[in-house]
Amino acid sequence: MSAKLPSPDRRKILAASAAVAASRFIPTQARAASASSDAIRSFKVDVPEAELTDLRRRISATRWPEQETVADDSQGVPLAMMQELARYWATDYDWRKCEAKLNALPQFITEIDGLDIHFIHVRSKHENALPMIVTHGWPGSVIEQLKIIDPLTNPAAYGASASDAFHLVIPSMPGYGFSGKPTATGWNPAHIARAWVVLMKRLGYSQFVFAGRGLGRSHYKCDG
């Protein structure tokens, strides 16, 4: 696997610009939340087998609509494709394998603004690595980022320079994966961006860069 990594000069520019952006993100309320509830708890995924069995049963019991009347996808996802996906999810997909991959990584939960936030935190072996927070999109989860962790934290193993290394923080957005579900409105991109700043400072990163796609990228546009 190869990864295109920024040059050291580009990393300096990214670090400088992101540090300025991060400092503008921290309101008084966010600082108070960080001071009053900053515990970081280890986390492991352990989905009960009964829940997996029930999910497979419900997938297998899907009541399918009539087949589309065209040979393309102009009427939506073709019935045959959805039926094949459902068959795979119900019979072939190995959740435990995915669970093991997640549990092989350092996972944590911390409370920010009253909401539990799940995240993966992988530090590079290179102490001068650049901290980066990476956010998944919609629909999506932290699983999207699993393949980039090793190339970005250990670039020398992929033919790049150790100076291109990153410390990675990969959170689950509120309401996604193993993060808590908001009970009220207000967790918009700007709020999530402020929460990510609190998270990074809680982990000891006063300066950092950020990356995301789709909805995950919109959080970082909030600083203009």
Locations of regions flagged by a protein language model:
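Phosphate/oxyanion-binding loops and surfaces in catalytic or ligand/nucleic-acid-binding neighborhoods
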Residues: V20, T62, P155
